[in-house]
């Protein structure tokens, strides 16, 4: 369902990300003692009483600084407010009202969105009431003293907030596809997100490491909803300092795990690097459906054979991910970007697909007829009794055999290829579990599965 949005607004370092973590009940927003740590607007699901909603974590709002990132952060905060049902304006109770708070308050009073004033860092009830009273002067109504770290006062804040939010029953269900956009730094992930959504949703800058959080954007195409997750660029461990980037990379790995499909973005000018190979291995290990997005194709000098040569190189270097579909695009010009979601749809369908035991065993029957299982040096031949799919996402098939050790890697790859070719598992990894089973055990289960 499309959840109502609550924007968290405030100047830098008043505890906005800590409040988001408190409301969302997790530690996803990066909290670290470095100014301006939240750059993009990031969405987190939250719940209170009978209301489901999203809290939007924005960068620290500053109106009088022209350094490179701050104007971009202002734009992101303003966009978050424009799409919100309500906003929480966070101030620092320990410092009292500042000129920056007054400037933000003046701007907020001109907006049509309901504003709730949260006075953070009020660590005691008595002192908090005194601290909060100083903020009446901002002209935004009653100040609510809270402690984001300890949670005190947040219940009263949320009671006020949900007055402005629709109930869960009034929200329509959607079959959402979660898509993580993953790759090395500066391969064009944020530009791709912007091209897919048609707005400057993620900050695009030539500075490496612009995207620090895994940030979400929900887009609709026809009847299908997609949650696009832009992630921080993933570098070699030895190049990552402990701090915000360290946390961001861990967040990117979590984004891979929660995604239905990964858009693995590769720089066409760099080709496949060692770091790309390691990242591809991580995606494959997590069992995620994948689309290989070769970006910056507009910058490549090419002739009529270039794309075929590049495809061969990709298939050679990423041989363990040969099941992934690939597309050559330019996020900068938008060329072929609109076709990416078609591949996402195909990969999702394969990733979620379930096949009956009867069909699986028909494939096995034909496969073993054309190519018999191997025989050991001692003359003992492998035998596949039957197979059954035990789960999807990714599709996982258990094969019951007389002895798993009798099936070498070549034959296992052959069986996997047969499943892919005959059952259409494109864009997703599949898992085959080879399980030993005696003839007597097979006979006891013959009423539950078709034997081969």
From Swiss-Prot:
Gene Ontology biological process terms from the UniProt entry: ribosome biogenesis
GO molecular function, one term: ATP hydrolysis activity
UniProt KW GTP-binding keyword: yes
CDD domains the UniProt entry points to: EngA1, EngA2
Binding site for GTP 1: 10-17, 57-61, 120-123
Residue ranges annotated for the KH-like domain, each copy included: 353-438
InterPro entries named in the record: AAA+_ATPase, G_ENGA, GTP-bd, GTPase_Der, KH_dom-like, KH_dom-like_a/b, P-loop_NTPase, Small_GTP-bd
Positions with a binding annotation for GTP 2: 183-190, 230-234, 295-298
Domain of life per record: Bacteria
Protein keywords: GTP-binding, Nucleotide-binding, Repeat, Ribosome biogenesis
Residue ranges constituting the EngA-type G domain according to the UniProt record: 4-169, 177-352
Subunit structure and binding partners: Associates with the 50S ribosomal subunit.
Family, per entry: Belongs to the TRAFAC class TrmE-Era-EngA-EngB-Septin-like GTPase superfamily. EngA (Der) GTPase family.
Known function: GTPase that plays an essential role in the late steps of ribosome biogenesis.
PANTHER family for this protein: GTPASE DER
Record protein name field: GTPase Der
Primary gene name: der
């Amino acid at each position: 369902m499309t959840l109502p949005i609550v924007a968290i607004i405030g100047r830098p370092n008043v505890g906005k990300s800590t409040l988001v973590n408190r409301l969302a009940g997790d530690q996803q927003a990066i909290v670290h003692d470095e100014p301006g740590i939240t750059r993009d607007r990031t969405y987190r699901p939250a719940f209170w009483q009978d209301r489901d909603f999203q809290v939007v974590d924005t960068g620290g709002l500053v109106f009088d600084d022209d350094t490179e990132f701050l104007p971009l952060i202002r734009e992101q905060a303003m966009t978050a407010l424009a799409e919100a049902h309500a906003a929480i304006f966070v101030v620092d109770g320990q410092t009292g009202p500042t000129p920056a708070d007054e400037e933000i308050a003046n701007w907020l009073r001109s907006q049509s969105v309901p504003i709730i004033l949260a006075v953070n860092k009020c660590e005691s009830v008595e002192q908090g009431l005194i601290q909060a009273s100083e903020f009446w002067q901002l002209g935004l109504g009653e100040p609510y003293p809270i402690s984001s770290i300890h949670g005190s006062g947040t219940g009263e804040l949320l009671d006020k907030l949900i007055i402005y939010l629709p109930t869960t029953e009034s929200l329509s269900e959607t079959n959402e596809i979660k898509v993580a956009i993953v790759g090395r730094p500066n391969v064009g992930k944020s530009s791709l997100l912007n091209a897919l959504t048609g707005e400057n949703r993620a900050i695009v800058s030539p500075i490496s490491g612009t995207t620090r959080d895994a940030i979400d954007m929900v887009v609709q195409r026809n009847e299908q909803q997609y949650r696009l997750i832009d992630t921080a660029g993933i570098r070699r461990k030895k190049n990552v300092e402990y701090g915000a980037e360290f946390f961001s990379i861990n967040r990117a790995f979590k984004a891979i795990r929660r995604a239905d499909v990964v858009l693995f973005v590769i720089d066409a000018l760099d080709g496949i690097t060692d770091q790309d190979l390691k990242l591809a291995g991580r995606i494959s290990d997590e069992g995620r459906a994948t689309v290989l997005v070769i970006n910056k194709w507009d910058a490549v000098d090419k002739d009529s054979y270039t794309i075929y040569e590049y495809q061969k190189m990709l298939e050679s270097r990423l041989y363990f991910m040969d099941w992934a579909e690939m597309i050559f695009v330019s996020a900068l010009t938008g060329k072929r970007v609109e076709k990416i979601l078609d591949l996402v749809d195909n990969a999702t369908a394969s990733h979620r697909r379930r096949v009956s035991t009867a069909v699986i065993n028909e494939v096995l029957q034909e496969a073993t007829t054309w190519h018999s299982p191997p025989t050991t040096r001692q003359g003992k031949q492998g035998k596949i009794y039957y197979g059954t799919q035990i789960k999807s996402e990714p599709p996982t098939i258990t094969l019951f055999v007389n002895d798993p050790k009798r099936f070498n890697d070549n034959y296992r790859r052959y069986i996997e290829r047969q499943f892919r070719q005959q059952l259409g598992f494109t864009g997703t990894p599949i898992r085959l579990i080879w399980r030993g089973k005696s003839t007597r055990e097979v006979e006891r289960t013959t009423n539950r599965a078709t034997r081969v």
